[in-house]
């Protein structure tokens, strides 16, 4: 093959969670991914890198459970399940001549990012107040992800990886920072916290904003520094 490595990031995400979409999610995120990996192996590609997601561990939690090496994936929706099944299909193809890298990043942010980050940015630019809830999230800046992937290829790695930024993020502090960069002022308040705490676990939107979802920092360490931006 003329290719040393394939980085597979294509897939369906941030689309409707309507049950009617389930078959399409599995077809694209699982079946086509495994099909591409099989072709890569057949054609002599040495390394296949698959972009999975922290979502394989389920949604955010009210309590501060930390994902460790022993944490068993328990996806709560067909997006997470399709990613996890794709992982298993790729792992089954691994051999001495065909290395597989599974990357489970947390929420990725940066210019042009999709998903929850743009929603938070929109909130930061429009609302005068925001709930100051004490939560923690693992996040990954796009430049740090790119450097991590570069090292995966350069070092001809194989295995399961969990890259993240050096520090966890508190949603309210992130929203306040975004507002500041856009020269907006937003005040953090706690009078809404009792309502938020009741809603965590009951509302997917509230879970994503104010729930806890973090990797053990030791899980994300690598022999070379990839966390080049704070």
Which stretches of residues belong to each language-model region?
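A conserved pocket-lining segment of Rossmann-fold NAD(P)-dependent short-chain dehydrogenase/reductase
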Residues: 18, 122-140, 144, 148-151, ...
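Active-site segment of SDR-like NAD(P)-dependent oxidoreductases
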Residues: 13-16, 54-58, 73, 106-109, ...
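Catalytic helix-loop patch of NAD(P)-dependent Rossmann-fold dehydrogenases
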Residues: 27, 62-108, 129
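Short alpha-helix in the Rossmann-fold core of NAD(P)-dependent oxidoreductases
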Residues: 26-33, 49, 82-83, 138
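NAD(P)H-binding glycine-rich loop region in Rossmannoid oxidoreductase-like domains
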Residues: 1-31, 35, 39, 56-59
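Conserved Rossmann-fold NAD(P)-dependent oxidoreductase catalytic core, especially the SDR/UDP-sugar
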Residues: 34-78, 101
């Amino acid at each position: 093959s003329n290719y040393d490595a394939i980085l597979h990031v294509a897939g369906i995400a941030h689309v409707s969670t309507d049950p009617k979409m389930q078959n399409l999610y599995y077809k694209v995120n699982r079946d086509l991914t495994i099909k591409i990996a099989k072709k890569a192996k057949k054609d002599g590609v040495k390394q296949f890198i698959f972009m999975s997601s922290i979502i394989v561990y389920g949604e955010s939690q009210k309590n501060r459970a930390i994902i460790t090496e022993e944490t068993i994936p328990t996806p709560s929706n067909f997006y997470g399940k399709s990613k996890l099944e794709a992982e298993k299909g790729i792992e089954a193809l691994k051999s001495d001549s065909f290395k597989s890298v599974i990357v489970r990043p947390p929420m990725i942010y940066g210019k042009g990012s999709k998903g929850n980050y743009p929603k938070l940015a929109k909130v930061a630019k429009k609302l005068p107040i925001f709930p100051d809830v004490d939560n923690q999230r693992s996040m990954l800046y796009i430049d740090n992800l790119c450097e991590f992937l570069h090292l995966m290829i350069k070092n001809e790695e194989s295995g399961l990886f969990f890259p993240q930024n050096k520090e966890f993020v508190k949603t309210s502090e992130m929203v306040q920072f975004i507002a500041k960069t856009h020269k907006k002022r937003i005040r953090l308040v706690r009078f809404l916290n009792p309502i938020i705490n009741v809603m965590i676990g009951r509302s997917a939107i509230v879970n994503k904003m104010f729930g806890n979802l973090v990797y053990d920092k030791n899980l994300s360490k690598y022999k070379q520094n990839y966390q080049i931006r704070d």
